[in-house]
Regions:
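Acceptor/aglycone-binding surface of glycosyltransferases and processive sugar-polymer synthases
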Residues: 1-16, 22, 34-115, 142-157
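Short beta-strand-to-loop acidic/aromatic patch adjacent to the donor-nucleotide binding site
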Residues: 20-29
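Short glycine/serine/threonine-enriched helix-capping/active-site loop
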Residues: 25, 51-53, 135-137
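Acidic, glycine-rich active-site loops and adjacent beta-strand->loop/helix elements
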Residues: 28-31, 141
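Catalytic donor-sugar/metal-binding loop of nucleotide-sugar-dependent glycosyltransferases
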Residues: 85-86, 109-113, 122-138
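DNA-recognition element of transcription regulators
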Residues: 119
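C-terminal catalytic/acceptor-binding lobe
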Residues: 128-168
């Protein structure tokens, strides 16, 4: 099961079974800091969703070399242009949603089962007129395991970008 498929299943479960007004999404590899959630709780009041961004003032990325940072930045610029979204860190896995926001996403329309899933969600949120905010985060690269980013992920990203060309 890819990342996007896991998110779809998890979000559907949460929306069906749990009674919570806010949902926090974060990676399980300790790269996101749970200590940042209280700040996010304060900031979401006037927004539909938040992105803990590695690309806003006050953010930091620990454990990435210059090459990884550059690749990530370029991919972010491409995603932003293709999907016509305002978010700078479109692949951040640290997010907070109001439940009513997640309920409006049509997960069946999302084709990507990898990292591009994150961008497709943002595209739908933009189409729905949802209001988002990026907040600074300290991202700590995992100390164990390895990135799942590979040729399959890159192909999904390229396919997604091409599919958005010509859309509003």
């Amino acid at each position: 099961m890819g990342l996007g498929a896991a998110y779809k299943e998890g979000f559907r479960y949460i929306l069906d079974k749990l009674d919570s007004e806010l949902i926090v999404q974060m990676d399980a590899d300790h790269s996101h800091q749970p200590s940042e959630i209280p700040n996010m709780l304060e900031k979401i009041k006037n927004f539909d969703y938040l992105i803990a961004s590695r690309h806003v003032e006050g953010s930091d990325i620990v454990g990435w070399g210059i090459g990884r940072k550059a690749t990530h930045s370029v991919a972010g610029v491409i995603a932003k242009a293709c999907a016509k979204i305002e978010i700078n860190d479109s692949t951040s896995g640290f997010r907070m949603f109001k439940k009513k926001t997640l309920e409006r996403i049509d997960f069946d329309k999302i084709r990507s089962d990898g990292f591009a899933f994150q961008i497709e969600v943002l595209y739908q949120l933009k189409q729905l007129g949802m209001k988002g905010l990026e907040v600074p985060t300290v991202f700590v690269n995992r100390t164990e395991g390895s990135s799942k980013m590979g040729s399959s992920e890159m192909m999904q990203f390229i396919t997604m970008c091409i599919s958005y060309i010509g859309r509003k």
